[in-house]
Amino acid sequence: MGQKIRKCKNCGRYTLREICPVCGGKPFSPNPARFSPKDPYGRYRRMAKKG
């Protein structure tokens, strides 16, 4: 019962399935990663995001 909603990378539609029913793409979890103040790699992730 614990299904999570997913968002397709190709078409951007939301689904509960493992494969997008519209385009056949692979959906991913649209939720961001959980925040932790003790994140050892947070500094590098923010630097990569800035470019």
UniProtKB/Swiss-Prot annotation:
<protein>
    <recommendedName>
        <fullName>Ribosome biogenesis protein Nop10</fullName>
    </recommendedName>
</protein>
<dbReference type="GO" id="GO:1990904">
    <property type="term" value="C:ribonucleoprotein complex"/>
</dbReference>
<dbReference type="InterPro" id="IPR023532">
    <property type="entry name" value="Nop10_arc-typ"/>
</dbReference>
<comment type="similarity">
    <text>Belongs to the NOP10 family.</text>
</comment>
<dbReference type="Pfam" id="PF04135">
    <property type="entry name" value="Nop10p"/>
</dbReference>
<dbReference type="GO" id="GO:0030515">
    <property type="term" value="F:snoRNA binding"/>
</dbReference>
<keyword id="KW-0690">Ribosome biogenesis</keyword>
<dbReference type="GO" id="GO:0001522">
    <property type="term" value="P:pseudouridine synthesis"/>
</dbReference>
<keyword id="KW-0698">rRNA processing</keyword>
<dbReference type="InterPro" id="IPR007264">
    <property type="entry name" value="H/ACA_rnp_Nop10"/>
</dbReference>
<dbReference type="GO" id="GO:0006364">
    <property type="term" value="P:rRNA processing"/>
</dbReference>
<keyword id="KW-0687">Ribonucleoprotein</keyword>
<comment type="function">
    <text>Involved in ribosome biogenesis; more specifically in 18S rRNA pseudouridylation and in cleavage of pre-rRNA.</text>
</comment>
<dbReference type="InterPro" id="IPR036756">
    <property type="entry name" value="H/ACA_rnp_Nop10_sf"/>
</dbReference>
